[in-house]
């Protein structure tokens, strides 16, 4: 983890205990901004990923992910996973079922930016199966 921390300018943060039930593996959370727009640096240990989930909103909403260190993946339901490396940006519209997490053999950190929306909420769903995750390249 120390080598990974040296790759980025954002803090790794504290163990993400508040959301641990929605992750397979250990993750860490560092709030970067909590006013106007929520921005959090999320760090995943190798093999860690979050459950499938949906960011709901009546209008607007969604999430933006910006990889800041390591290597990871983002996947929308029904589509192939997309590899993320530092500098890659993923725009996730509201109502899209998806997951994101680290590559099996590398740490991964991304900024998670909450897109403001009307009546926004998150719905956490089932874990990403080992079979699904095992298909990653």
Regions found by a protein language model. Give the residues of each.
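Asparagine-centered strand-capping/turn motif at beta-strand->loop junctions
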Residues: 101-103
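Short, conserved beta-strand element in jelly-roll/cupin
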Residues: 42-45, 56-74, 113-116
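A short, N-terminal "cap"/entry segment at the start of jelly-roll beta-barrel domains
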Residues: 1-40, 51, 121-137
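A short hydrophobic beta-strand segment most commonly corresponding to one strand
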Residues: 91, 105-124
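Conserved SET/PR-domain catalytic core that frames the SAM/AdoMet-binding pocket
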Residues: 41, 45-47, 93-95
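Short acidic-glycine-tyrosine-enriched beta hairpin
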Residues: 78-95
